[in-house]
């Protein structure tokens, strides 16, 4: 697995990294992913309103990010086993779970999107940091 900045980055706030995925190179738009993670981790204020449409939009975006990052991380760590691959397997199963409907259960949906954002943050580090087969992944997986 190689990750490297790509010449495709055109603006200072548009860092991109090419990573080896299971089906070939994948370009990861780091700042865009980080912005979606930040949106998923936005605090829910007690008594404040939760916009179900916004939660649904952020959830859908983070699910796409998680699927892409997970595929790259699985390809990168497939031969290493251990804690990392156990966490990746667990996250793969969790992505298949049905999430709460934000219109019916907005607080539960907001908590789920925050959990998904934390998982994306961990995956982003796994695919952009140097490979460490002894890495212990502490997350909510």
Predicted regions and their residues:
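Secondary-structure edge/capping motif, primarily at the C-terminal ends of alpha-helices
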Residues: 40-51, 73-80, 98-105, 127-134
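Long, acidic, intrinsically disordered low-complexity segments
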Residues: 2-19, 54-79
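Hydrophobic transmembrane helix segments
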Residues: 28-41, 45
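Charged, amphipathic alpha-helical oligomerization/scaffolding segments
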Residues: 32, 36, 57, 61-68, ...
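Amphipathic alpha-helical binding modules
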Residues: 92-141
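Short, charged, intrinsically disordered terminal tails
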Residues: 2-31, 121-141
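Non-transmembrane, amphipathic alpha-helical segments
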Residues: 17-29, 46-61, 83, 101-115
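Amphipathic protein-protein interaction modules
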Residues: 63-112
């Amino acid at each position: 697995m190689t990750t490297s900045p790509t010449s495709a980055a055109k603006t200072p706030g548009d860092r991109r990294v090419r990573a080896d995925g299971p089906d070939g190179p994948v370009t990861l738009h780091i700042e865009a992913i980080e912005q979606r993670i930040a949106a998923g981790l936005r605090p829910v204020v007690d008594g404040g309103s939760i916009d179900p449409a916004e939660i649904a939009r952020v959830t859908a975006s983070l699910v796409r990010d998680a699927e892409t990052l997970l595929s790259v991380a699985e390809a990168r760590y497939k031969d290493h086993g251990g804690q990392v691959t156990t966490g990746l397997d667990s996250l793969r199963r969790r992505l298949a779970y049905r999430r709460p409907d934000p219109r019916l259960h907005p607080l539960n949906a907001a908590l789920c999107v925050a959990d998904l954002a934390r998982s994306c943050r961990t995956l982003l580090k796994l695919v952009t940091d140097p490979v460490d087969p002894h890495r212990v992944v502490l997350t909510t997986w």
